C-alpha cells in the first residue's frame, strides 16, 4: 500500500461525468458526458459515418469543450445511465484519463460505477476497454446505489455504518429507487421513475414560456435550468404556497437576469410559481407526464413492500438520497412526511381489520439528507477506494489475462467491515 498512487474514481452519468482521485472529498472535474466528433454526411450506420483516417481519430473533444464546437457532431454516449455507444465511450475515457486526470493509467487502480440493472455483458465491455486499451493494473466496477449508501455515513443522522437501505438516486436522465440489503442490490424490486432533472427543466421551461414573453428562445432552456438550480425548492402544501405568492408577492418572487447569447443584450424575468412547481412533479408527476401518475413516496413504499419481509424495517429506516435532483430544499422532509402518512395509514388499517386486537409496532421512516448528496456516488467511491481492502477486491490485469473479461461480471462487496 505504501508508495502506491491513489486510485482513480470515475462516475459516468447521463448528464455529467464526475472524476477525480480516491481520498478526496469531491471530484476534481465535473464535465458533461458528451463527445464532439467529426462526422461525414454519408448515409449509413454510425460506424460508417465516422471519419476515421488515422489522424482524425484523435480529432475529438469531450465535456464543456465538446459543447462549444459547432462544426463537430456532439454525441451523448450514455442514455438513462447505461452506455449505448462503446466506441465513443472508449474515446471519452481516453481524454478523461490523459487530458483531465493527467494520469498514467498503468500506475493507477480504477473504480468505475455502474447503474442498477446494468448487464453483465456491459461489465465485460468496460473491462475490455480498461484492460486492453488502457492497460490498467486493477479495476473494480461498483454499483452506484451501494456507493451512495456509503456516502450517507457522513450524515449525523446515521448511527452505525450499514449497507442496508433504500437509495433514491435521481440524476439528469433517470430516477431509480433501489433497495440494498447488506451491500447487495435486490434487483427484482428496483423501480425507476421517468422523472428526473431534465424533466424538471423542461417543465419549468414550459411554465416560463407560457408566462414570460421576454426570454429569447435560444436562451430558454438555459434560463429554465438556472431557475431550477438557483431558486427552486419543495413546498409542504401547494395551495398554501400559491396563497403566499398571491398575498405577498414581493417577498417571494425573484428576479433572474440573463444575457442573450446572440445580441449580447441583458433580459430580466420574474420567477414566481416556477420556484415550487418545478420540483413538485416528483410528488405530482401528472403535472408534466400524463402517462405516469404515481408520486415518488408511493413508488418508494411499493419498492419496500416488494422486498423480503425481514429487511423492510431497516429499508424504511435508512432512505438515502443521492444525485443532483435530490438537492432541492426540503425534498427529504416532504418525502419523509408523505411516506410516513402512507405507512401509518396502512398500519391503522391493519389494526382496524383485526378489530383492534392487534397493535402493530410503529414503523420508523427516516429519509437521510447529507452534505455529500450531489456527488454521493463519487464520494462513496472515493471513500471505499481509499481503503486497503479495495486493492484486495479489485480484479487485476493478471486475473484478466488468465481468465478473460468474464471476471468483471462479479465484483465482491466490501467496506461494511471497516
UniProtKB/Swiss-Prot annotation:
This is Actin-related protein 3. SMART domains: ACTIN (SM00268). The lineage of its organism: Eukaryota, Metazoa, Chordata, Craniata, Vertebrata. The modification N-acetylalanine is found at residue 2. The keyword Isomerase does not apply. Signal peptide: none annotated. The gene is Actr3. One of its GO terms (cellular component) is concave side of sperm head. Keywords: Acetylation, Actin-binding, ATP-binding, Cell projection, Cilium biogenesis/degradation, Cytoplasm, Cytoskeleton, Nucleotide-binding, Nucleus.
